[in-house]
Amino acid sequence: MATRPGPLTEWPWQWMGGYKYLVLAPVAMHTAHRLATKGWGDFDPAYTFMLPTLLLRMIHNQIWISLSRYQTARRKHLIVDRSLDFEQVDRVLYLDDQIILNGLLFYLGYAIIPNFRLMPVWRTNGALITILLHMGPVEFLYYWFHRALHHHFLYSRYHSHHHASIVTEPITSVIHPFAEHLAYFLLFSISILPPIFMGCGSVLAGVLYITYIDFMNNMGHCNFELMPKWMFQTFPPLKYLIYTPSFHSLHHTQFRTNYSLFMPFYDYIYNTMDSSSDELYERSLKGTEETPDIVHLTHMTSLKSTYHLRIGITSISSKPCNDSVWYMWMLWPVAWLSMVLAWIYGSSAFVVERLKLKKFSMQVWALPRYNFQVMDSSALGKVSPSTILIEKAILDANEKGVKVLSLGLLNQAEQLNGSGELFAKKYPRLRVRLIDGSGLATAVVLNSIPFGTKQVFLCGSNSKVTRATAIALCQRGVQVILNQEKEYGMLKSRVPESRAIYLKFSNDETPQIWIGDSIDDAQGRAPKGTIFIPTSQFPLKKARKDCTYLSNPAMKIPETMQNVHTCENWLPRRVMSAWRIAGILHALEGWEMHECGDDMMTIEKTWSAAIKHGFKPLTKPCSLNSGTDL
């Protein structure tokens, strides 16, 4: 929103929320009626291309968003290296408003302009007129209109909404008040309407012109430099005819320079070109390689989790993952295509996120594999494709000089690699420290148990964290009850003999505190009011309304952590899993040991370090020193 919003700032359908697409319902109904009564033979090229054009524009924009986020995470050709936060993401989510407006105006033009319905697929003379009109009147008028928008009166009421984003993304290009979009539509109509009225317009010329506008807008706001130098060396006048991402980025950081639409020519002749334009272009194009201090290695979960990656769909990745949302089912074809591409081309981990805390830089790498691929039962017990990918990522991190690599989700599965022990033993001279995060995860689980708890039910002990939690509770005088003989026998051999009395096998007792990694299937046996505390990285199925479900082991991150604008899987905003935080703490504290296999950081030590560095528990902290405080 602008600093002092003026008339026509909000979109007319803003009050409709997620139902705003209903404004296109009359158009859809008219199309359906026309198809039912007259058949496909009555559809002319202009009418036929309208809906596909709108859909292709949305796909085109999404490709740019994904490409930009991937490149800025890699950082090499980054232009503006500043933090991006949730406030900006929420402000720029609604790129589809422009598509809806354009759809309505296109259909309106089709209905009232006879020549619109007579356009052929292609006419060269009309396309040339469109190009000339854009290079002349459109670029010229836009330049002066843009300068006018930077006058205090219009800037405070309208254009400041766009400039609230100093760190730009492709989506920033269409984030303007409604009134500005109307003005831009009229401006671009100067290139489209005259050929139509002259009888030389064509459908393809219009579609290509709109695609050109979208391409240049997205490129100018992508925040990484990609225009090759050889283009300007081969044809020097080109620097006056096409801008670069760094050229327009200066407009967002300096505000009163580089006003041109797509052709810097007008900034040159009116002396408003930023003097550092060439230098910033050279520096951004050359780029610098960044070696992160910390890497968190994750992977995709379900097929639809592709959209939840930072390089996926912005409106989805900025919220906790929810596969049950209705529109996710509409995207199934894209999910399947992503899986196929990941299987064919996914030979290594790729960067999806870049963060910073204090002097430490962090990256998130994702393996191009899903849950069902990582834990493929046919590959367990032998070297699986996922194990090879994890090993390759570890060796890449080691070669680059990464200090700490934390294993997320199933990348640390005991059945797969012994919580990372396989790699630590195979490569004893690894400089990068491998972290499974079990120490901090156990500390968070212990901290989540209500004060005064004397008895807990352990549901499953398949994970390192679950076993460590049970042993810690016994050592603190809290009775741990199991109803599985095999698990009971395994745990009893690990609990100190003096504390074995606190480990109990029983089929009759059901305390109201349930802890473990296999809770989902056993929830029906829990008494009313039970508190479920998971030890797994995956969320519980909330099958009971009369029970309380706590989060997976996780903590709130410090306010000083920069560039956080996506959610980690199903966790809330600015919350990280304990396994991921453990890797960060390892680097912050300068700890030298691996935490993998049977090795685990001291629970009290990791908890104290987390609190010291500004991480906060999601629940009220409990003492870790005695059972009575649990």
Curated annotation (Swiss-Prot):
Residues in Fatty acid hydroxylase domain copies: 133-272
Name the EC number(s): 4.1.99.5
GO CC, one annotated term? endoplasmic reticulum membrane
Q: Which GO terms describe its molecular function?
A: aldehyde oxygenase (deformylating) activity; iron ion binding; oxidoreductase activity
Any idea where this protein resides?
A: Endoplasmic reticulum membrane
Its placement in the membrane is given as: Multi-pass membrane protein
| Endpoints of the signal sequence | none
Any one Pfam family here would be: FA_hydroxylase
Name of protein: Very-long-chain aldehyde decarbonylase GL1-7
Native source organism of the sequence: Oryza sativa subsp. japonica (Rice)
Supply the gene name. Answer: GL1-7
